[in-house]
Swiss-Prot record:
UniProt cross-references to InterPro entries, sorted A to Z: Ribosomal_bL19, Ribosomal_bL19_CS, Ribosomal_bL19_sf, Translation_prot_SH3-like_sf
Entry protein name: Large ribosomal subunit protein bL19
Function: This protein is located at the 30S-50S ribosomal subunit interface and may play a role in the structure and function of the aminoacyl-tRNA binding site.
UniProt-recorded Gene Ontology molecular function terms: structural constituent of ribosome
Record carries keyword Ribonucleoprotein: yes
Organism annotation: Orientia tsutsugamushi (strain Boryong) (Rickettsia tsutsugamushi)
Gene assigned in the entry: rplS
HAMAP family xref list: Ribosomal_bL19
Pfam families, per the entry: Ribosomal_L19
Family recorded in the similarity comment: Belongs to the bacterial ribosomal protein bL19 family.
Length: 124
């Protein structure tokens, strides 16, 4: 293993210490709890939506979450190993046949709904 990959693996271990990252895929509904720092105050803000894309690039891994807020679609991209993410919760598992769900941007209402796969929280 070359030095860069070894260094990245060490950094990933350090960043995930004390946190559990669930095994989620595009189509799953997740709740991302973010640490927001405003001056001297620090608070946790939840962002819940459907994962429409995931990029697995070692320490630069990221995922995009889409939610509908006040009738408008909002997408936000998160770095998987960011220290600002306090936790990620898997809410629902979806059944999709694509790795990137960008087509959901053009759909509205029931057409944008994703079938749900039944799972137990213990088994994830």
């Amino acid at each position: 293993m070359n030095l860069i990959k070894q260094f990245e693996q060490e950094q990933i271990k350090k960043l995930t210490q004390g946190k559990s990252i669930p095994n989620f895929r595009p189509g799953d509904t997740v709740k991302v709890n973010l640490r927001i720092i405003e001056g001297a105050n620090e608070r946790i803000q939840a962002y819940q939506g459907v994962v429409i894309a995931r990029a697995n690039r070692s320490i630069s891994s990221s995922f995009t979450v889409r939610k509908i807020s006040h009738g408008k679609g909002i997408e936000r991209k998160f770095m998987l190993y960011s220290p600002l993410i306090s936790s990620i919760e898997l809410i629902k598992k979806g059944v999709v046949r694509r790795a990137k769900l960008y087509y959901l941007r053009n759909l509205q209402g029931r057409k944008a709904k994703i079938r749900e796969k039944i799972f137990s929280k213990d088994n994830q």
